[in-house]
Amino acid sequence: MAHCGAGGAAPVALLSSPGHGRKGLPRKGPGERRRLKAAVSEQLSRDVLRLLREEIHTDTILSVSGSLFKVHKAVLLARAPGFHSHIIEHTSSDLTNELVPVDGVEASEFKAFLQIVYSSNKNIKNYEEEIVKKLKVGSLMPEKGPDVSFPRYRTSSDCFLGKGEIPEDITGGGDCFISKADSDLEPASELGGDLLKLYLSQHYPDIDICVDGRSFRAHRAILSARSSYFAAMLSGCWAESSQECITLQGITHVEMNVMMHFIYGGTLDFPEKANVGQILNVADMYGLEGLREVAIYVLRRDYCNFFQKPVPRTWASILECLIIAHSVGVESLFADCMNCIISHFARFWSERSFANVPPEIQKTCLSMQIQSLNHGNAAFLLMESDRLIMGLPRVKWTEAALSMASQLQEECVTFIVENFSQIIESENFTLLLQSQAMSSTAHLLDKIFKAIEDNITAENSCSLLMALDTLLNSESTKEMGFTCRIQAVRGKLWAFLVQSFYAVRHTGSWKLMHLDDQQKIQVAALDKGDDRRLGRKPVLTSSQQRRQGSDVDVLKIKPWTENNKKPCQTSLSTNQKMRSDGLGASGHASSTNRNSINKVSKHGDSTKMSKVVKEMKTGGKYVSGKSKTMVKPQTENSDHTKIEGLSSTVVGRPSRVTAAGRKDPVHGKGVQNQEVETTGARPKVLTANLNVQARAKPLQTLRGKDSTCPASVGPSSRSTHSSTELLASMGSVDETKENGSVEDKCRDGKPYVSDSPGQMVSNGVMSTAAVKSRAVARITNGTASNKSFTHEQDSHGNSSVIKRGDGKGLSASAPQTAAKKRGSSNGCTAAQPRTKSAPPTLAQAQGSQGESPHSVKSSVSSRQSDENVTRLRHGTDKQIPKRKVVKQGHTTLQKVNAKLVPMPKIPSQPKKGGTVNSKDSKQKVLPGQIMLQSHASQRPSKPEVAEKSVLHGVSDSRNHVSKQRPHESPCTLACDTSGPEVSQIPCRPQPQSPLGSQEKKRLELACQDRSTLGDSVKRELRSELAGIEQSHTSAYKDSSQCNGNPNCGSIAALKSVISNPNENLINSNPVHNSDSANTEQAYLSDRERETGRENTDTEPSMSCINGKAFLCVPEGTSSTLNPTQSDRRLTFHGAAQSQLPDDCATEDSKCATVTSAVSSKCLLGQPSEKNCKNMEMSETPESHGTPEAPFVGPWDLNTGATHQRESPESDTGSATTSSDDIKPRSEDYDAGGSQDDEGSHDRGISKCSTALCHDFLGRSSSDTSTPEELKVHEGDLRTEVRVRKQGGGDHQIHSASDDEIPRKKPEPWSRSTIGYPREKGSTPRGSIPSAQEGDQVSSSADETEDERSEAENVGENSSPCSSGTQQVQGIINLAFDDGAEHESREFSATKKFRRSVLLSVDECEEVGSDEGEGHTPFQPSLDSLSPSDVFDGVSYEHHGRTGYSRFFKENEATTAEHNHNKGNGGYKNESFLLNSRSKDFEKQDKQCVSTDQKTRLDVPPKGSQQLFPENEEVISKREAAHSFQQHSTFMDGDTKSQERPCHLELHQRELSSNIPKISSVKSLDSCPSQGLPQEGQVKESRPTPPKGANNAVFSGDIDDCDTMAQTSMYDHRPSKTLSPIYEMSLTAACEQEVESETHVADRGSEDEQHFAKQDWTLLRQLLSEQDANLNITSSLPEDLSLAQYLINQTLLLARDSSKPQGSAHADTWNRWSELSSPLDDSATSATTASVSSTDCSPQGEWTILELETQH
């Protein structure tokens, strides 16, 4: 604090000789000193005069002419020694206030004299002499008097001068404080000088002040006059007033000396040793305002050199002065210092002493520096800050300065962008341009231009354009060579203006633009003023920021394709645009990604196709890839394209690709490019990038417009499928028209939810994806067969998942987007939740337009009929195929992401009901997407199931798909196909006008399939759609689907259905009535489809439609139970029913076709692949090829080779989905435990996303997991998949894509137990990937054992499951309701749905048992379903639990296997993944059937049951056939499909006795598989109360799954399996629980943006509450039950894994161990599970942490 040495010396010099001392000082110094001196002297004069007037502490009284004057001897002595001497001789020195007469002077004259003495700043010697003369003349005394008095006077004078005794005293006692420097201090005036002499001479002192042991003798009167502090102290109120000596604290003797000098003399300087800062404090303390001013003056002079141009030695001292001024509070000085620092900030900030400045002062420096920005200095400050950053060393003391400089630079850039037009005219900007021209890199200019691009808004775009024109025309710019840079920015601005013309033309700056520019923009404008499109119009960042939901997507799309913007804003009018856009603004990111992918794909399509073909040839690998694809349903289109292509290349990769594809829509460009790079593999980068984008934007959109963007994104994937067909159509006029219809429907849906824009985008994205897919398909015409097969299958799987997401639709859109980002499996689930909402919308849209239904169905049919369509569209699509494929890839990815997000949305969407549905339909390619949404509704759990299945239960997924397809074989196939394929295919059908109609129906079917979550709705839609489609395109579709798409459709549908069943189960639980109705009808439809492939199917479809309509009513009843969910479903049903008949008919025909296709597809993997190729070759170019292409294209486009890696990542996504599934299941701990699951740990996002609670999970994923996390998670899984792929075909497949494993597994089922419906469902799943045939065969066997166990368990748990189902049904409806949906879902789903199906294997095991128990009470309401339910639940539980333990170790594999194991005991060990998946899918199928049947039981149970068994058989047969075909490489997919051996085998393995139950209760099986797996799981884990079980299962399941997910996620990719499983049961349960939770969260979740946050918050709350209220049968049954249920299920699953598995389970375990050896022993997993279940209380009150630790 001491002033600098130079400053210290200066004062002395100045004091000694002001003139000399100021020699080096500028004129500013002397002027300030003069002013200070005048002020101080004036103050001193007033203070001393006050002594006289107030007669303070006087000691003498003078009597003049009768008047008395009280005076002070000391003052008189100091000022008038002669007068003092004259008076004193008459007084006694000992007396105080002695009266002294003064004669010879008038009173008035004497008074004036005294005033002069006390106040004059001048020498008063003349006045004194006059008075003394008068006194002498008037004296009566002789000369003696004068003589006598003179000596006294003289003595007095001498004494005053310090020559007598006093001087000795002074030297003796005054040396301590009187120094030479002190003597040099300059007094303010003569008065000050006289008083200072008095102080130094110490005459008449009357008080001693002790400081630091030193004594300062002073005068009370002067102290009191000068200091308010001393005046109060000595006034008589304090004890010091009567003391001779007082002691002062808190002050040093140096400071006291300075203060005394100022009090007496008003000195203007300080001694060298003085601490100026401390003296400032002393001045404040003692009330010496003058001293404060002196101190400030000294600081300015000695520290700051009066703020003249700083010199190096003053940098540090000014900073020190700044600190002093801040600490003492001298604002004026602080401001001066700050202004100086601002003027030279670069020099000050680079000072080392700047690091010592308090942080608050540093912040003030920065803020004031920013405030100082103006048009003139902004460019200069930018350059200075850059120099500072470049010049500072990277050491600790510069950290603060570097940080501040970086912030300042950002602020400068922001300011420059905001005031660009003014700043470019400043001189400093010219200097900036010059410096940048001379610099090696014009990084500052690039920063400015990038900021301009990122901050373009409608308001500033015109002014920016004019400013850039000004720059371009300036000579300096041309000379410096920045023309290209400026033109690039101007080009983007121009694109924005063209795309946002309608918004821009209303701004004030528009009128200022050049007329030529205005006219050009108006002519080129995409938007001529459609208000609806305007909402989605903004393409750039600013717009995105404004529009959190659709704008984000729009922005994403716009930069990539101006057309995207237009489709976003005018879905109806911009159908063609949507085709190119990938459905519009909300799909913008996806569309952009797809476009980018398309561009890449155009070059690499052939490569991709060949890769796909190669992979297809690979068989196992291809199967694996396809399995992943199933998991990947979220990224329907691009994922499909990629997955199909990728699946051929890398079995393990497709799943990752799926995950990546899911992410890709989010990432957009980056993903596309990546996808292109990784044609064969799922793009890992794509996943990361896309996921990041999707996550950021869709989630952003989600949060801002939760349903808009996410829905868009989610539906985008589906839409991409349907859009693929649509886009193909859009490529041509027909395509456009188709898209228009779909989009019109989307529009219709648009009003319902803010998601409509996003969904519309999704539609566009879907279309794009479809085109892309198609393009790829075309390219790979020859390989299309293989590729298409896988692609179709993948597409179907994805479609089913997407459908599930669509079910969630808009509500779940955002959360689903998050989930998608999290992982492919999550993407699947998310997509399906979206579908939930979408199906009603689709129904509405379809009702509005036949095309829409056709579109939906078309998506399914698209795969099949799309092959025909592909041919038709070949020309059309060929025009747009690559671009569309690219778009589709993006869209698909984004859509998948959105769909994952939508999963949570579905709960809220049920509330919105028709509205959400309408929006969903809007989001989706209306019919297809709506159908997808419908399916998604049912599939929110299904997507996870699908993902899980994909991971390890692809067979399961296919089994489920098969099962569902038996119900909704055409519809479900269409729907399932639509799930992944609807996105791709719907676009294709739409491109084809005729086919478009059918394909739309397929889309609807796909949507329905998706709405497997809302099975009632979905199945209703499917039946209707099947009917409609059949009526419209029954024969055509049948032939086309049967020929080309049936394989894809069947497999995809099976896949979807497989995922759907679980999802349906879960959703069925939360939305069980609706789902059940849908499922039943879907099963009916499937069965009918299988029975009557074309005409017969049409009739059954119609029956289904009727049944669905009937179901719709009961669903309404269910709706009563779960008003929101049911509402949504009912809305969907109502809307869909009109469409459903056609679609159902079509789908029935499709089912027949699909059944054939399933067989074909099963065979397609190998023999049926030829079939598929033949059919698909004709249709594959478009249909199959397109699905393939979309898969490959989107995936490859997005990531190229990386994509396939992402395929494993997709599996991880699946695992993530599992985690998400688990998450939703543990709704209560969604907030914190969303990432506890295997997938969650690796990719917490995916976990959450795929969680049962579509709304909750989707949001959770979005909120919790970042795209980076997702990437990491996916990357880990991807790595596993790759290793597995490379290491072992089956093992690789299992690891890479569990769905492939299930496919292989279903093969054995199909062979060994063709008679088992469930196994058949598994077979189609299993047979999807040909490469997996071997694994699938073994898996089938394992699955069969698991199925037997499941059958046994079903027998045990059938009544509880039914009971649980019933309870859950009410909750199920709530699942459709955002908030209500969560509540009911988490409660009902936990109990009614076999969350285990959707849960990861671990989760399923845990949840399955707990859920089983929980569901056991609830599922009895399923009545007829109970046997099947129990079977599904139990066997699923046993296997799932066993798988669960392993899953902990091999999260992914185990997850898949868990489901499969639950479904197939035997399959568990060797093909645990496959088994789990197969089982899972079987269960899913069963669960779907069960769900349908449950719904039917709720609504038309009888018909439903009957239909269900048939459907299930058909599905099982299909699955079996599919699996068998894949493994056996048979071409008679139809026969195999009918056989359904895998499914039956599953039951046999599980329990021979249960197999009959399953076949008879097949429809119930689907539901029970949902409810029972949970039930069984609960049962297996331990018999916990349903609610307790639910909670325990949820929390525990999450933990276990999480632990497993962590463990096995890396080695295995059960994550996807986990996701599908989770989706099947956990999604529904969690969805309902989430719905309960999200009831609260989703009440705010009307704002789709708040879904994730709310869900997480609710989950956290629930988790926290859950610990306290483990038995949540009261206030928060759903929420707390979720956590408790998860825990219970985890424990029960663990216990069940060890106990009830039996030989079949042991066998499964052994096989699983083989499969999961890299990860962990199945036995170890089982043991872990057992330990946790054993250790935990029956209530499953373990904390999630404990469970996690245990597992």
Swiss-Prot record:
Interacts (via N-terminus) with adapter protein complex AP-2 subunits alpha (AP2A1) and beta (AP2B1). It is found in: Cell projection, Axon; Presynapse; Cytoplasmic vesicle, Clathrin-coated vesicle; Nucleus. PROSITE patterns: BTB (PS50097). GO terms for biological process: synaptic vesicle budding from endosome; synaptic vesicle endocytosis. Neuron-specific protein. Primarily expressed in brain, with the highest levels in the cerebral cortex, hippocampus, and striatum (at protein level). Not detected in glial cells. Pfam families: BTB, BTBD8_C. GO terms for cellular component: AP-2 adaptor complex; axon; extrinsic component of synaptic vesicle membrane; neuron projection terminus; nucleoplasm; nucleus. Residues 13-37, 533-607, 659-682, 701-762, 782-1002, 1064-1102, 1173-1373, 1405-1436, 1483-1509, 1520-1539, 1553-1595, 1716-1738 are annotated as: Disordered. It comes from the Eukaryota. Residues 734-750, 864-880, 941-959, 1085-1096, 1268-1308 have a biased composition (Basic and acidic residues). This is BTB/POZ domain-containing protein 8. Residues 566-577, 588-599, 714-726, 824-835, 931-940, 1064-1082, 1329-1341, 1355-1370, 1418-1427, 1553-1572 have a biased composition (Polar residues). Involved in clathrin-mediated endocytosis at the synapse. Plays a role in neuronal development and in synaptic vesicle recycling in mature neurons, a process required for normal synaptic transmission. It comes from Mus musculus. Residues 58-126, 205-272 form the BTB domain. Its main location: other. Keywords: Cell projection, Cytoplasmic vesicle, Nucleus, Repeat, Synapse. Residues 852-863, 1210-1219, 1716-1737 have a biased composition (Low complexity).
